[in-house]
Amino acid sequence: MNTNKNTVFDLKSKFKPSGDQPQAIEKIVKGFKEDKFKSQVLVGATGTGKTFTMANIIQSLNCKTLVLAHNKTLAAQLYSEFKEMFPDNKVEYFVSAFDFYQPEAFLPKTNTYIEKNSQSNNDIEMLNLSALNSLIERDDVIVVASVAAIYASSPPDDFFKNRVAYKKNQVIPIKQVQYELVNLNYQRNDVDVTHGRFSVKGDLMEIGPGFTDEFNYRISFFGDEIEEIAKIDPLTKQVITKLDEIVLPGAEVYLANRDTLEESLKRIKDELTETHKNFLKQNKLIEAQRILERTNHDIESFKEFGFCPGIENYSRHLELRAQGQTPYTIFDYFDKDWLLIVDESHMMVPQIRGMYNTDRSRKETLVEYGFRLPSALDNRPLNFNEFLSKTDKKLYVSATPNEWEIEESQQITEQIIRPTGLVDPIIEIRPTQDQILDIEQELRKQIANKERTFITVMTIRLAEELTEYLRNKNIKVAYLHNELKTIERFKILNNLRKGIYDVVIGINLLREGLDVPEVSKVLILDADKPGFFRSDKSLIQIIGRASRNVNGKVIMYADTITEAMDKAIKETERRRNIQIEFNKKHNITPKTVIKPIALDLSKNDADINIDELISKNKKSKEKIDRTVKKLREEMLAAAKNQEYERAAYIRDIIMELEANKK
């Protein structure tokens, strides 16, 4: 692994830290560098620029960083922002590579075995491989990850060993190179060389590195000697640059170590013998027969291919780990001195806590009924204590941190002042009687002022009825529900910003991507009802949706003031008073956030009706593959022309198509 410590994180931005950012950056950096704090919390109000603060902290601490986000969409958003701020450093993306995942399970009550069923996303697998490869090779790396980070990954030593290097003037037969690539799970394809594939035409070999689709390698042979190595454009085949040496990791994140495979198989056989014997002692003949047949079938696959379906269930033996030993994860690719940032920690920490028990409960049933060896229990995510032990620098970031993060941390830093001077919105409580008529009147005022509105409700029925009512009143309204695909959601929010809609109604308006500056009013129905969506933390998050506009206001419809409402209102007033005082002291006039509306893709060739496309091609996987190939070429061309929004849009279309392949 790379041990060079001359890391330099170079933050590029036209902005300088302002508002509360300078004091927050200084305080947190000092806490880690001088005070040697292990855990800190950044309490950042919505719109105060928490991501920019994180970027400045990374630059000041100058160490590898892992940023955890609680879902793929938020992770993608952070990845995009960090990539823009650190163009000369390595910013990577590490999330679950499954578009669809149904884990293996057994339901004893109905005697139903559910086979693992999944749809992998090749592009995300490539990005995950790129993240591990960068951590092995470089120190100036930021990885943005989802909860996938706590799940088992290839051991760093194995990943490092499963690489091949080729040098100019090296004497090696072309067949030997092919053999080595196949051993690393590269596939020969002389027609379409994408990542993880290679082609051979005469004395020319083209390789799509497993970790990127931005370029391919071309190796020219003269007899058994490598005459030239070049990095080439995958589409045009033009030479980007000539190289003296290349290093290729495996085509997949997880590869069995062939050097230790014999020992691994012996361990599997020994455990099988013991498990089979135990089932027979208990007179569990069906389970005994089942574990014998299933495991022997997997052993034969290992012998022939070095691989088997469900290979991850044998990870303890393949990695020669002891029973109960902590599995290897992406955390093990970081050096001792690195930073962990847990973004939206109020959501992320509970998610991490719950993963271990959920996984173990399912696998214990599989083991009990002979579907898996007991060692399958060691193919697992980290438990919470293991997660906490992985680094001595943890920063929890949230507008509403939980009590656990507060108690765990040695220092709490508030970031309340916004660089724009915007203050938290005014909150008004109104009775529920005649609330629908009142909402209609409020929306008429908003429309007259050319400002937008969010309405959050508690039930699907109310959301649908209110949407229908407002449409009948000729109000341009959209309902943001959880069945919408990412692209459709993106379009609705874009259309709200452009005025195609005046109001958006939703149940969970806490999700990422709802920072819309044009929204000056948020209406909260059933504000006094108990439940997660009306807790004090949730209410503060909802209130924050109106904090991007100078005219921000929140109306709560309620007949009583609950404890949660009272806490949220008092905290908002506290922050608002601090912000107003700061503005007076520094003579700052608040300004609505100016945020460019994303590229209008409806006028672009890339604007494709996904449902229609899938419907047309659902009987032909080949047709979808051809369409994906064409779109991938468009995506690469758009990225090359720096049309990043269009490229991202096409990427989302590709992901939707591949997820729906039969």
UniProtKB/Swiss-Prot annotation:
One GO-annotated biological process of the protein: nucleotide-excision repair
Cytoplasm recorded as keyword: yes
InterPro entries: Helicase/UvrB_N, Helicase_ATP-bd, Helicase_C-like, P-loop_NTPase, UVR_dom, UVR_dom_sf, UvrB, UvrB_inter
Matches recorded under SMART domains: DEXDc, HELICc
Motif Beta-hairpin per UniProt: ranges: 97-120
Gene3D superfamilies: P-loop containing nucleotide triphosphate hydrolases, UVR domain
Name of one Pfam family that matches: UVR
Primary subcellular site in the record, as a coarse category: cytoplasm
Chain ranges of the Helicase C-terminal domain: 438-597
Superkingdom in the source lineage: Bacteria
Transmembrane segments: none
Domain UVR: 625-660
Subcellular location per the Swiss-Prot or TrEMBL entry: Cytoplasm
UniProt domain Helicase ATP-binding: residue ranges: 31-419
UniProt entry keywords in alphabetical sequence: ATP-binding, Cytoplasm, DNA damage, DNA excision, DNA repair, Excision nuclease, Nucleotide-binding, SOS response
Residues noted as binding ATP in the record, renumbered to the chain: G44, A45, T46, G47, T48, G49, K50, T51
Entry annotated with the keyword Nucleotide-binding: yes
MF terms in GO: ATP binding; ATP hydrolysis activity; DNA binding; excinuclease ABC activity
Any single Gene Ontology cellular-component annotation: cytoplasm
Function noted in UniProt: The UvrABC repair system catalyzes the recognition and processing of DNA lesions. A damage recognition complex composed of 2 UvrA and 2 UvrB subunits scans DNA for abnormalities. Upon binding of the UvrA(2)B(2) complex to a putative damaged site, the DNA wraps around one UvrB monomer. DNA wrap is dependent on ATP binding by UvrB and probably causes local melting of the DNA helix, facilitating insertion of UvrB beta-hairpin between the DNA strands. Then UvrB probes one DNA strand for the presence of a lesion.
Entries under NCBIfam families matching the protein: PRK05298.1, uvrb
Written domain comment of the UniProt record: The beta-hairpin motif is involved in DNA binding.
Protein family according to the UniProt entry: Belongs to the UvrB family.
Assembly and binders: Forms a heterotetramer with UvrA during the search for lesions. Interacts with UvrC in an incision complex.
Name of the protein in its database record: UvrABC system protein B
Gene name in the database record: uvrB
